[in-house]
Swiss-Prot record:
Protein name per Swiss-Prot or TrEMBL: DnaA regulatory inactivator Hda
Subunit annotation: The active form seems to be an ADP-bound monomer. Forms the RIDA complex (regulatory inactivation of DnaA) of ATP-DnaA, ADP-Hda and the DNA-loaded beta sliding clamp (dnaN).
Keyword Ribonucleoprotein (UniProt): no
Gene name tied to this protein: hda
SUPFAM superfamilies: P-loop containing nucleoside triphosphate hydrolases (SSF52540)
Keywords, alphabetical: DNA replication, DNA replication inhibitor
Amino acid sequence: MNTPSQLSLPLYLPDDETFASFFPGENATLLAAIKLAINQPHGSYIYFWSRDSGGRSHLLHAACAELSLKDEAVGYVPLDKRAYFIPEVLDGMEHLSLVCIDNIESIAGDEEWEMAIFNLYNRILEIGRTCLLISGDRPPRQINLKLPDLASRLDWGQIYKLQPLSDDEKLQALQLRAKLRGFELPEDVGRFLLKRLDREMRTLFMALNQLDHASIVAQRKLTIPFVKDILHL
């Protein structure tokens, strides 16, 4: 059993992946639904999906961070990293205020894990006090699960598609993250990054973090020549 503010797994939650740093774009409805769900006294369930995993994990990290600040007990389970833990880690999670399950598609075909998630879902449903957030890379019915009952359970409740950001929205998301970190990302530099790098937000944010550190060390503002030098572009 977890005590308040502890995570069920000894995993690092990025301190810059909060609700404040999430640029919603066309996902304002999903963001509002998650904020409402995690603050309800009774149980709730939301499933959301997208091909880009970065935004999904960001929202789950943000939900965990939000409730941890209120001394609520939360659990975050990244199923793409399940090689590092066993299904029994889910035991007792039905007593937490929030359970976030990331990358549900990763367990497709793994009967032991499918049954463990199914049983946890049922326990959460029975007790009725836990908010359950699950993310995947496709709608529930398109995941090739061996356990039909789990596929049916995942299809209950609220289901959202996390809409991708446009290039202009990605630029705004990068500038927001830079502002929260205490530096400025000029528009021309941001557009250069979008043009030269993989457009997945996780890749862009990693580059932004690298540039932030390099600019502090070099005591320089971000310019295109500086970015080219640091990122070897």
